[in-house]
From Swiss-Prot:
GO molecular function list: adenine binding; adenine phosphoribosyltransferase activity; AMP binding
Enzyme Commission number, as recorded: 2.4.2.7
Descriptive protein name: Adenine phosphoribosyltransferase
DNA damage recorded as keyword: no
GO CC annotations, alphabetized: cytoplasm
Lineage: Bacteria, Pseudomonadati, Pseudomonadota, Alphaproteobacteria, Sphingomonadales
Function noted in UniProt: Catalyzes a salvage reaction resulting in the formation of AMP, that is energically less costly than de novo synthesis.
Catalytic reaction annotation: AMP + diphosphate = 5-phospho-alpha-D-ribose 1-diphosphate + adenine
Length: 178
């Protein structure tokens, strides 16, 4: 399937979760077997070209796409979790949200020093979560130079924020608005 055909599988829900927001709902893409498989192939090819040695994804939808890309390439998957979800010792990073803060954690033993890790997630908006994930992976010893997203919302500036830290950003599709 082409990227335009994949884009047509994304449902837009107006005024969710608040008035004026155009929510880009990936569940319609996830439910479409051929579309989901094509998405993994497109993202997998980009990760392969980036020289990925492992794939990382953030809870929760990053697990779907990140694990799929890892399987596509025969690579390991590094889950980046919310606090208190990993049974082993963890390292973490706090990051700012619009109203407060949050935290991401990883098992540092899962990351090999110098390993080329590509971050994969469903959507990039402001980039806060992806920036925190990159910081965390680097803290664990990984080399992070690439992040892949199904959807970019360029008006929110997240992709540029990642680029400003030296991370190459690729997205399958972009949508105007929030």
């Amino acid at each position: 399937m082409t990227v335009e055909e994949l884009k047509a599988l994304i449902r837009t829900v107006p005024d969710f979760p608040a008035p004026g927001i155009q929510f880009r709902d990936i569940t319609t893409l996830l439910a479409h077997g051929e579309g989901l498989a094509a998405t993994m192939r497109h993202l997998g090819e980009a990760a392969r070209l980036a020289g990925a040695e492992a794939i990382a994804g953030m809870e929760a939808r990053g697990f779907i796409f990140g694990a799929g890309v890892a399987v596509e390439l025969g690579l390991g998957f590094l889950p980046i979790r919310k606090p208190g979800k990993l049974p082993a010792s963890t390292i973490g990073v706090d990051y700012d949200l619009e109203y407060g803060t949050d935290r991401l954690e990883i098992d540092p033993g899962a990351v090999e020093a110098g390993q080329k890790v590509v971050i994969v997630d469903d959507l990039i908006a402001t980039g806060g979560t992806a920036l925190a994930a990159a910081k965390l992976l680097r803290q664990a010893g990984a080399e992070v130079g690439q992040a892949l997203f199904v959807i970019d919302l360029p008006e929110l500036g997240g992709a540029q924020r990642l680029r400003d830290t030296g991370i190459t950003v690729d997205s399958l599709m972009a949508f105007d608005g929030h």
